[in-house]
A protein has these predicted regions:
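Juxtamembrane regions of bacterial inner-membrane/periplasmic proteins
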Residues: 1-221
């Protein structure tokens, strides 16, 4: 009886391993299909492509300080940040907030639905790890900065920092001053919520926070 039980346990474990490998391969195919190709053309979307090295270093630094300070040290998922957020929620009564890395955000924005389910978060984490195994950090940052949603004007959406710069400031992203860079980074949290036309005070408060971080924190890049 023990031998039969042991045999079945081994079979079940092998089946689980096979299912996991198959699922990981499927996710890998989705990631490769999305990120090994050029940007697709989307109707009613303004998107200007820049290479990573064309973006101002101050802008990249602000982005990393606000969205993912451990970007160059993790492998797609920041487990330390997840534990820190959970600890703060459970023991310090802090608001439960997201702990998604830039890689996870890129996966979510490019491939996944907005559903806040456990299964989607698991998919997001696995695909972020696959993304980082497949591409270097500069590519991931470049892709994120070229595709992230920053504004809406009627039926037209503006994706990427370069198009956001043209929309909000009517200038090339390389010509932005620090406050304008901080404004674009601030808008990542919610272009509607921080809309400069409707909520200037709300936006200003967040911009000041980002400028303070940029001035006082150790540079990441």
């Amino acid at each position: 009886m023990k031998l039969i039980t042991s045999s079945w346990i081994k079979r079940i474990l092998l089946l689980c391993i096979f299912i996991f490998i198959s699922y990981a391969w499927y996710l890998n195919s989705l990631v490769k299909a999305e990120f090994s190709s050029d940007f697709g053309s989307m109707e009613d979307v303004i998107q200007v492509q820049y290479s990573f090295d064309e973006y101002p270093k101050d802008l990249v630094n602000m982005l990393l300080l606000v969205e993912d300070q451990s970007f160059f040290n993790h492998s797609g998922v920041d487990f330390k940040e997840i534990l820190r957020v959970l600890y703060g929620y459970l023991f310090d009564e802090k608001e439960l907030r997201g702990a998604s890395t830039i890689s996870q955000q890129l996966i979510k924005n490019s491939l996944l639905s907005r559903d806040k389910t456990l299964s989607r978060k698991v998919e997001e984490a696995l695909m972020a790890i696959i993304l980082e195994l497949s591409y270097d950090k500069k590519f991931i940052l470049e892709r994120y900065m070229n595709t992230v949603y920053l504004a809406q004007q009627g039926s037209t959406a503006f994706h990427g920092f370069a198009s956001g710069s043209l929309h909000y400031f009517e200038k090339d992203v390389s010509s932005l001053n620090l406050r304008e860079m901080a404004t674009l980074v601030a808008l990542l949290k919610g272009p509607s919520y921080f809309n400069p036309a409707n909520f200037p005070d709300r936006l200003k408060k967040r911009v000041e926070m980002i400028l303070s971080m940029h001035k006082n924190y150790k540079r990441i890049i």
